[in-house]
């Protein structure tokens, strides 16, 4: 799909690349994207689910220590440049319907449902193929 200047949600994999220690082209692209938010030229959205997935991936794979990951998440949650969104118990049945209708994983379906409930229809993700729902514009900024 095409890129838009509307509000985009930042997927967990973009966060992982932006904050990993090893230098890479993907890290540079992810960091440059987040810098747009840090320097106030764009606002992005982020969900608690993304932050939880980020912590799980970076600590499990040894990319960051627990304390470093915790400090990053605290900074992200306090940073005003991110619109924070979250799901509630009503979102879960919607996610299950999305899972059935689009043959998506539960976690991607939950994120899609959370986005829809919050009026966010764009996502930056390395896994654009996982968000084939017709209301989502999935863009891979790392490609």
Indicate residue ranges for each PLM-predicted region:
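Short beta-strand scaffold positions
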Residues: 10, 45-46, 86, 106, ...
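Short active-site oxyanion
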Residues: 40-44, 82-83, 119-122
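Short, well-structured N-terminal submotif of metal-dependent ribonuclease cores
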Residues: 1-46, 63-71
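Acidic, PIN/NYN-like endoribonuclease modules and their adjacent C-terminal/linker elements
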Residues: 1-7, 112-143
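A general alpha-helix detector
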Residues: 14-15, 53-57, 94
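Acidic catalytic patch
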Residues: 45-50, 74-100
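Alpha-helix capping/helix-boundary segments
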Residues: 14, 50, 91, 110-111, ...
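Helix-adjacent hinge/juxtasegments
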Residues: 56-79
């Amino acid at each position: 799909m095409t890129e838009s200047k509307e509000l985009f949600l930042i997927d967990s994999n973009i966060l992982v690349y932006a904050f990993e220690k090893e230098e890479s082209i993907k890290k540079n692209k992810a960091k440059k994207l987040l810098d747009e938010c840090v320097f106030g030229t764009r606002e992005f959205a982020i969900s608690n689910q993304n932050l939880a997935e980020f912590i799980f991936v970076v600590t499990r794979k040894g990319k960051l220590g627990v304390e470093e990951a915790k400090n990053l998440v605290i900074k992200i949650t306090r940073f005003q440049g991110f619109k924070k969104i979250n799901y509630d118990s009503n979102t879960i049945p919607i996610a299950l319907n999305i899972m059935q209708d689009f043959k998506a994983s539960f976690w991607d379906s939950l994120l899609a449902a959370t986005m829809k409930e919050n009026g966010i229809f764009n996502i930056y993700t390395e896994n654009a193929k996982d968000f084939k729902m017709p209301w989502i514009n999935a863009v891979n900024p790392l490609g």
